[in-house]
Amino acid sequence: MKYEIRHAAALLSTGHGMVDFYGNFLPILLPLLMTQFGLSLTMCGVLVMVSSVTTNMLQPVIGCVMDRRNFSPLLPWLVPAAAAPMCLVGYVSHTALLFLVVAVTGIAVAAYHPLSSMLIGRTAAEGRGNGMMSYFIAGGNAGMAFVPLILVAFLDYFPLRALPLLLLPTILIAVFFLRSGLCAVSTLPEHTPTHPSKLSHVLFARTTITLNLAMGLRCWTHGAFGTFLPLLLVRSGEDTHAAGLFLMIFMVGGMVGGLVGGNLADSLSGRRIIVGALLLCILPSAYYFTHVSTDVLGGAVLFAAGFMLMAPQPSSIIWAQQALPENAGMASGMMLDMSFGLGSLGVAATAALGDVIGLAPALLVSVLALPLAAILAYITPEPRS
């Protein structure tokens, strides 16, 4: 059943941007938190791991619960729940509470993603699911892209205890959600099956396995770019400002790629978009890792790599939701963040390999994931609808 909610995609995309904005405070705040709590590098690593596990790996679990219970009424409160803990971190006095703050933020972020992506699918006009999902993905990418710019500028003028001022936009979006009618849109399957699918059947379905692996391999290359590009440029003799600028170019390319890929998938098949983008991404990715530069050509190649790496994501979410209609929440959680969790394993392998053969060659190895991802996407059964 389709629900007609005015500006639903705009509201959910804005909420996505805000959730990903607040959910990515930790890397920027980490140097300050190390000083405030006397954290070692090991403890910082554990803190980041807690954030990653709660944000990424919990999403399919939360999505599975949402497939059995209607959680739409919680929508207005999830953005404030994701923002408040990190904005109150200046008032935390114990390390254990710091870990709790990070975990609560991660759980709220993990809950927003599958819920809002299901609502995108339920409110999109017929034949516009991929396009609306592309705007949703772009919202999240924009939120992540602006964290360094806004948070660093804020902390240049205000102390850590002033972070609650940044909570004001979350109150506004909560009011908009309450008045939008989205809370009345059920996330439960339209036709409740007499015998619900067993979790094992969902997890080991061919579509689940191959599409998850394909997107996980894509996220390996994407994560390698996002994690090591600044370090690669600095080691190549560039300053940190240039490194930050070119990372932003890569992320903007990804945001545009998600928009274009999602909208094209409404007229072409999701498989064509995903496989085509993955194959087209091989050349710019391999070229940049063998010709590291900050000139115009380097910027154009980086933009193209980011574009092609993110173009498949909206289609993968719609594909998974259509293939698993009784478990749309779980499918959304897998495609949105579990794939990034799988990709992070590849990023860790890239880091370890970089210590042995050098960073640039190790990053070049990560490009090998793209043709494998394309093959897996090609053999994934496409849903009929």
Where are these regions (language model features)?
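Helix-to-loop junctions at the C-terminal end of transmembrane segments
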Residues: 58-70, 258-269, 354-355
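Conserved MFS/SLC helix-loop-helix module at the cytosolic interface between two early adjacent transmembrane helices
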Residues: 57-93
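Structural signature of the two symmetry-related core transmembrane helices
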Residues: 73-87, 272-287
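A late C-terminal transmembrane helix in Major Facilitator Superfamily
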Residues: 326-356
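Residue-level signature of mid-helix packing/kink "hotspots" within the transmembrane helices
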Residues: 24, 52-60, 145, 251-255, ...
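Helix-loop-helix hairpin linking two adjacent transmembrane segments in secondary transporters
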Residues: 136-182
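Cytoplasmic helix-loop-helix junction between adjacent transmembrane helices
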Residues: 101-139
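Extracytoplasmic gate region of multi-pass secondary transporters
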Residues: 26-27, 207-248, 255
